[in-house]
Amino acid sequence: MKKLFSTLLLLLVISAPIFAAQVTGKVIDAGTKQAIDFANVSVLKGSDPAPVKGTVTDEKGEFVLDLADGSYTLVASFMGYSEQKREVTVAGKPVQVRFALREDSKMLQDVEVVGQGSSMRFELDKKVFTVDQNIASAGASVSEVLENIPSVEVDQEGNISLRNSEDVEIWINGKPAGLNSENRGQVLQQMPAGTIEKIELITNPSAKYSPEGTSGIINLVMKKDRAAGFYGSVQAGINYALAAPWTTPPGANVGFNINFNAGPVDGYFNVGYRYHTSNGGSITDRYNLDGTGSEKLDSTLINSHLTQEGQQSHRGGGMFGRAGLNFHVAQGHTIGVSGFGMVSDPKVFNSINSNHRTYTFTDRLNPANNREFTRDQNGNAYHPGGMATLDYTFEQDAHKLYVSGTYNNFGFNMLTGYTQIEGVDTTYQDQNSLSNGQGIEVKADYEWKPTPQSRLEAGYDYTRNWSNSFADAHNNNAEGAHINELFPYYSDASGLTQNHAFYVTYGNRFWDKLSIQVGLRGEYYMRHLESFYKDKDGNVQDSYAGMENKKDTSYFQLFPSAYISYDFGNGHELQLNYTRRVNRPWGHQINPRMDFSDSTNISYGNVNLLPAYSNNLELNYLKTWERHTLSAGVFWKYREGAVQNVKYMDSDGRTMKNTYLNVATRQELGVEVVAKNRLFGELLQLTTSANFYWNNISAVDQEMYHLGDTIPVHLPGQNIFAGSVRVNAQFLFTKNFSGQITAAYRSPRVVAQGTTSHSYSLDLGLRYTLLNKQLALALNVRDVLDSRARRNITWGDGFWQFSENRWHSRSVSFTITYNFGNQRGRRPNRQDGDLGGAGDDFDDSGNTNTDSSF
C-alpha cells in the first residue's frame, strides 16, 4: 500500500505540467496603484457570454489560470470599478496579463443600491456566511447568529449541533481557542456578532485539520481588514423581551471598532459591552411506571405522576475586547500578534413549581400521597476568558510557511442558592461550582507548489489542554450559614490531554478538469484524568477505583482523507470525499459534578466515556448560473461508540438522573440541498436550504457505574426519517431600505431513549441607511411566533416523560451603527484563520474553489 501511494504521488508530480499552460496576472487600482484583492477574473471563449473558467485575486492582487491552447478573453471586475478586458492567446507558453481598473462613479452609486451583498458563498467543500450581510446580526451575539445558519441548531442551553449532532468543533480563526462543550455556550452568547467577519461550515475537513468533531467544524473568522487607510465603526443597541414572566429590564450593547493600515504595519482594535436578558420556561410531565415505558404511554402501569412548571430569567453583562498588529518586516515576511479577552457576570433566576402524586391505577382520583413544593434558584457567576496568538508567515514564489503559538484560558465560577418551600417547611441550600481550563497550541504549516496545478502540504500540530472542576453543596439556615454538607454533590475532577499530530496532503489537477487530493494525519494522544467524590459518610473516594486503566490512556491513530472533484464546465462541478474523524469526550460529558437546580432531575457526567469514531462519505454537486446557485449533496456517517444522553430513575423512585453513554453505533444517510436565487432584478435574494436524512441508533444493553453503584441500561434501537427546511429572504425596497425574513422548520427526530418533537421559528429584520451608508439603523424581531422551544418524549425502565424547555421568549431589538474613516477604500479581504476549504483549494486559479457569491 505504501509503495502504491508513493508511486501515485510521483506520477502526479511528473505528469502535471503537460496538461495546460499558465496565465498569470495582477489587478491594481489605476489611481492608487494598490493591489485589488478578491477581484473577479473571468475567462470567455468565442462568442459564448458564459465564462468557461474563473478565479479571484489573492491578497497581492495576483491570479493564476491554467488554460489549454487557444484564444480567450479575460475580464477583470470589482465592485465600484469599470470592468476591463484583455485578449490573450495561449500556445504552450506562459502568458502574463495586467489589469488597471478605474473607479466608476456611476457604478459606485449602483453599488449602493445592491450594497446588501451576499450573505452566503458556496464552495464544493464548505459554505461561507458573511455576518455583516445578515440584518439579524445587528446587536446580536454569535450564538444568535448561528441559529440562522442552515444545518446548524442552537438549543435552549446554548448547545450547538451540526446536521443533527453535537459532535461539532467550534474554532476561532482556524484554532480550537479553548472552546469545548462545557464553556462554548457561555462564550458565544457573550461574543458580539459584530466582531465576526464570516462563519465557515466545513462538514468534512481534510487531514490538514484536527479530526475532532465527527460532524465537522464551524470556524468563526474574526474581522481584520487590511485595506489602506484608517476606518472603524461605533455601534449601540437595545433589546427587550416581549413575553417576560418577570418584569425584566431591557438588554443593551455598545461597541467600538477601529482598523488601520500604515504600510509596513496594520492593526485593529475592538471593544464592546453587552448586557443580555432573556426569559423562558419549562414544563415536565413524568409518569413513574411499574414496568418499562414505550413511545405510547401505558396508563395501566402508572404508580405516580410528577407535574412541573418553571419560569427562568437570565441576565448578565460582559466586556469583550480584541486587538491585533501585523508587522510586514520584509517582502514576504509577516509577524502578527493578536488576542481577545472577555469577562462576564451571568445571573440566573429560576422558579419551579412541582406536584408529585402517588396512586394506583384504580384510585387515581384519591392519591395516597400528594407532594407539592416550589424551588427557587438564584445564581451568580463570574466568567473570564481569553486567547493570545503570536504567528509568523513567510511567502516566496511557490513556498509558504506559517508558524504560530496560541494560549487560551477560560474560567467559570458560580454560586447558586436554592430555597425550597413545601407546605409550612422551608429549606435552604447552595451549590458552589468552580472550573478552569487552559490550553496551548504550537503548529507549523508548510506549503509547496511544484507546479501551478499541484500542491504539497505538511505540518506539525502540538496541543496541550488542562482543566479542573470543583463543586460542593450544603444545607443552610435562613441567614445563609452552612449547617451540613451534602456529600453526594461533592466532586473534584481534573484532566490533562496532550496531542502530537503530523500531517501531509498532496493534490493535483489533470486535463484542466479532474482534481485529486489525498491526505494522512497521524496523532499520538495522551490523557490523564483524576476524579473524586464523597461517600455517604463524607470520605473522599476515587471515581476510578478498580478502573485505573481508564485513568491514563495513550494511543497512536491515523486519520486519512481523500477528495476527487471533476469540473464539467459551464458551472457544473462534482466532488466525492472521505474522512475519518473522532469525538473524544471532554468537558461536561465526563465531569461527575451533579447539578441539582431541579431536585427531581439531576444531571452529571460519565467518567467512563470512550472516544467515538466516524467514517464520513460525501458526494457534493455545485452548479452556478449568472443569478442562481445550486448546491446539492449526499452524506453518509457511520459512528462507533456515539455518545448519547441517557435517563434513568434513581432508587428512591422520585428522582430522575441524566448522564452520557457510548451507544453501539449510529448511522445517518441524508441529502442536503441549498439554493440561492436573485429574483426580480436586485429586489429579492432567496436562500433555501433543506436536509433530509435517515437516522439509526442501535440498541444498548450494558452496565454503567456511578459513585460506586452499578446501573443497568437497556435502550431499544431507534430509527426515523427526518428533515429540516430553512428559508432566508432579503428584500431591497429602496436604495437605502432593506428587509429580511428567516423561517425554519425541523421535523421530529430520534434520540437514544425517545423522540424530539418538531420545531419552527420566524425572525424579521429591517435596515435603513443614511449619510451615504455611514449611518445604519436596524430593527429586529426574534421568534415572532414565540415558538422556539425544545419538546422531548423520553421513556425507559420505570418512566415515561414529556418535557418542554424554552430558553428565550419573543424579543425586539434596535441597533444604530456609525461607520467612519476611509470606508470607500474598504474591500473584502482574506482573513487569517480562513480554513480555505475542506479539501484545500489546491489550485490557486480557483478552479476547485468555485466562488459562487453574488
Describe the residue ranges of each PLM region.
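Surface-exposed extracellular loop regions of Gram-negative outer-membrane beta-barrel proteins
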Residues: 411, 526, 537, 570-615, ...
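Outer-membrane beta-barrel translocator/receptor signature
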Residues: 196, 211-218, 226-283, 315-319
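Short, acidic, small-residue-rich periplasmic hinge/interaction motif at the N-terminus
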Residues: 28, 40-44, 77-79, 91-135, ...
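Short, acidic Ser/Thr/Gly-rich low-complexity loop/linker segments typical of extracellular
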Residues: 46-62
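Short acidic/polar hinge/loop motifs at secondary-structure boundaries
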Residues: 64-66, 175-203
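N-terminal periplasmic accessory domains that precede
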Residues: 94-100, 142-145, 184-187, 201, ...
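Face-selective signature of the C-terminal outer-membrane beta-barrel domain
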Residues: 3, 320-344, 375-534, 567-571, ...
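Outer membrane beta-barrel strand-and-loop segments of large Gram-negative receptors
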Residues: 439-443, 485-491, 604-606, 610, ...
